[in-house]
């Protein structure tokens, strides 16, 4: 699976969000970054898709990884065979 439909929900000042962005950027993943503090509809979408409001949250198709660190992100990408 490619990363073409990858959405990363973030909030300003979130250190784990920055770590997630660096991880994805360094490995060449393409993703849409959405700041849920600037977009109320995106915040509601985040809650609907993930059942919570924590960031970072990564959504790829039907796969959702909420509130994660780099180890969980790496495992998630490998498990779902998501390539840059």
Each model region followed by its residue ranges:
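Local sequence-structure signature of Cys/Sec-based thiol-disulfide redox active-site neighborhoods
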Residues: 1-27
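ATP/adenylate-binding site constellation spanning eukaryotic-like Ser/Thr protein kinases
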Residues: 11, 51, 70
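Short alpha-helical
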Residues: 15, 41, 72
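Thiol-based oxidoreductase modules, predominantly thioredoxin-like and allied folds used
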Residues: 30-42
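Non-catalytic, surface beta->alpha helical segment in thiol-disulfide oxidoreductase systems
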Residues: 61-84
